[in-house]
């Protein structure tokens, strides 16, 4: 069992009671028979007429599991509803909440009952019910303090003072309807408030937060909450003008020829002279690109000012020079598109990011998952991997090379079971699945290889026809998979929003939920990494002294279907989403032994 210190509870799950099918409680206010004319009217859901029934069984189970996993006892949905009713009245009367109920586990909280002298005695509502009769022999301020202390002790304070009645959560005991009054007041008094002191994660979207009633929005400021959607706090309007801008020159150690210039923002407040001397000592010699630091760190935190860097991944040796600059090469249209994407993201919408192979989506995914815990990152290879899994479950899925579906063996249930299986694979994170489209590309390449030469046009034409036959399928297509996959992940794992990586512009239309997109551009030539990766992949083949993989052909295919108008540098995406503060020289100086 984990403890509440390392796992936090879903705020969206707690606030379920504020939504009808996750929509708002009805705004029709109803006065209960026990509510004083001077007290607040009570919001309640007209569709739920019984206090212990009518709650969705899946919600109850998920609520219990979520609290238990965090190391706490879950409140019942009915208890949460009662607590929200009382909290609303508290806020309307006091314009605040008692701090004490959020600091320690206050199980029972008292309230005020207005009792005119003529109303007669009030019986105990339940065995643990305790009353305190407020004397009139005190000043108003003294009465306020006395009432507060007794309420925090769980006692019901009886008073004839209307000013006190109107300063606290208060009710009226209706002697003419004693049975109903006792039942209602007993239910309110036995409400357990201890769940307010538990830690929560704010997994509500910006739209949902904006729809919260005032009492609920203010309630959040009292609770122990971590905002998992860090974009609300960390998104920036522009590059921080107080940071230093710089240009790096990368020079081949053997040739002395400049291999490129890169612009960056320094996450380093030291003087440029000190930084320049430190940079001169850095030698980028045969460092594996996959390691943090050095070339990897430089390229992910900078923008190329010329052609993307080309290099032999297996052997390179670079020297660095750094120059201060006031230049900001970012195109206004690039920044406008970036801000439009963030605006849509902050509003709770799903967004898409176009990124071809080997531009760094794996690293971005890891960073985004760490920062935005309730953001579902859909990888550009997810659909291809799903098709591989589907073929494992239904080997005779396709009738022919045109990928017509074999209706005699394929059933919808196979598709649904495979979606669940793939979700478990994603959650596990250790199972490696090849994407079907790499295998398909390899087979097409093999059929179009003559005398050691590839017919590139024929390869792309054949792959394009087969690729779109699969993704457009009404039975196993792209849209169907992602719709079911998204719903499954949202329903079972508390995801609230999607960031969907795709390979090319042509894939945007297949995903129905996104309202904004950008195209990412790396500061290096991704083909360098594709050559490196070929030696590790079983689909690779050799032509003369160079490795040509299906991945490289896929990269070129996707490139044909991606517009390069105003692309967004990877560094800009990382900076605006709060994934980096700029280039750290200390990380750049790391060698392979650190």
UniProtKB/Swiss-Prot annotation:
Keywords: Host cytoplasm, Host cytoskeleton, Virion
Compartments where located: Virion; Host cytoplasm, Host cytoskeleton
Assigned GO CC terms: host cell cytoplasm; host cytoskeleton; virion component
Highest taxon in the source lineage: Viruses
Role summary: Minor inner capsid component. Displays NTPase and RNA 5'-triphosphatase (RTPase) activities. May function as a cofactor of polymerase VP1. Associates with microtubules and plays a role in the formation, structural organization and morphology of viral inclusions, where the assembly of cores and the replication of viral RNA occur.
UniProt name for this protein: Microtubule-associated protein VP8
Organism, scientific name: Fiji disease virus (isolate Sugarcane) (FDV)
Gene name linked to the record: S8
């Amino acid at each position: 069992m984990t403890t509440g210190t390392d796992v936090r509870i879903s705020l969206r799950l707690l606030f379920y009671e504020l939504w009808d099918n996750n929509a708002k409680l009805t705004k029709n206010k109803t006065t209960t028979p026990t509510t004083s004319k001077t007290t607040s009217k009570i919001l309640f859901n007209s569709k739920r007429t019984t206090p212990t029934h009518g709650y969705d069984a899946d919600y109850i189970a998920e609520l219990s599991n979520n609290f238990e996993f965090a190391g706490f006892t879950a409140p019942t949905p009915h208890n949460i509803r009662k607590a929200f009713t009382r909290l609303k009245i508290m806020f309307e009367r006091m314009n605040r909440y008692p701090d004490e109920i959020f600091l320690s586990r206050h199980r029972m909280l008292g309230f005020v009952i207005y009792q005119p002298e003529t109303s007669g005695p009030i019986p105990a509502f339940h065995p643990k019910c305790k009353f305190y009769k407020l004397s009139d022999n005190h000043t108003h301020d003294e009465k306020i303090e006395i009432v507060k202390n007794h309420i925090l002790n769980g006692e019901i304070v009886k008073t004839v003072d209307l000013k006190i009645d109107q300063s606290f959560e208060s009710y009226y005991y209706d002697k003419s309807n004693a049975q109903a009054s006792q039942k209602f007041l007993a239910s309110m008094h036995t409400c357990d408030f201890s769940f307010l002191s538990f830690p929560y994660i704010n997994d509500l979207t910006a739209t949902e937060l904006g729809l919260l009633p005032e009492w609920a929005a203010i309630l959040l400021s009292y609770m122990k909450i971590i905002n998992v959607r860090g974009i609300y706090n960390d998104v920036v309007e522009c590059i921080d003008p107080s940071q230093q801008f710089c240009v790096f020159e990368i020079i081949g150690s053997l040739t002395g020829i400049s291999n490129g210039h890169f612009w960056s923002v320094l996450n380093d407040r030291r003087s440029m002279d000190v930084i320049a001397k430190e940079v001169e000592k850095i030698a980028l010699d045969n460092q594996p690109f996959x390691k943090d630091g050095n070339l990897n760190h430089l390229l992910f935190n900078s923008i190329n000012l010329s052609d993307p860097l080309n290099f032999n991944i297996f052997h390179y040796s670079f020297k660095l020079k750094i120059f201060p600059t006031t230049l900001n090469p970012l195109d206004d249209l690039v920044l406008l598109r970036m801000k439009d994407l963030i605006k849509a993201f902050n509003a709770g919408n799903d967004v898409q990011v176009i990124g071809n192979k080997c531009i760094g989506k794996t690293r971005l995914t890891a960073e985004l998952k760490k920062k935005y815990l309730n953001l579902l990152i859909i990888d550009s290879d997810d659909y291809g991997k799903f098709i591989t899994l589907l073929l494992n479950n239904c080997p005779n899925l396709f009738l022919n090379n045109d990928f017509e579906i074999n209706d005699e063996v394929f059933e919808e249930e196979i598709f649904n079971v495979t979606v669940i299986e793939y979700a478990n694979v994603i959650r596990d994170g250790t199972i490696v699945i090849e994407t079907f489209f790499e295998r398909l590309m390899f087979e097409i390449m093999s059929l179009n290889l003559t005398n050691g030469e590839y017919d590139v046009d024929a390869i792309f034409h054949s792959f394009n026809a087969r690729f779109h036959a699969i993704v457009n399928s009404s039975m196993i297509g792209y849209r169907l998979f992602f719709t079911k996959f998204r719903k499954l992940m949202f329903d079972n794992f508390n995801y609230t929003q999607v960031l969907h990586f795709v390979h090319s512009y042509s894939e945007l239309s297949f995903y129905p939920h996104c309202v904004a997109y950008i195209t990412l551009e790396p500061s290096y030539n991704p083909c360098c990494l594709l050559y490196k990766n070929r030696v590790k992949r079983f689909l690779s083949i050799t032509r003369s002294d160079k490795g040509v993989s299906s991945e490289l052909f896929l990269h070129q295919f996707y490139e044909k279907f991606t517009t390069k108008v105003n692309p967004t540098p990877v560094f800009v995406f990382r900076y605006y989403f709060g994934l980096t503060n700029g280039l750290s020289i200390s990380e750049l100086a790391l060698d392979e032994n650190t």
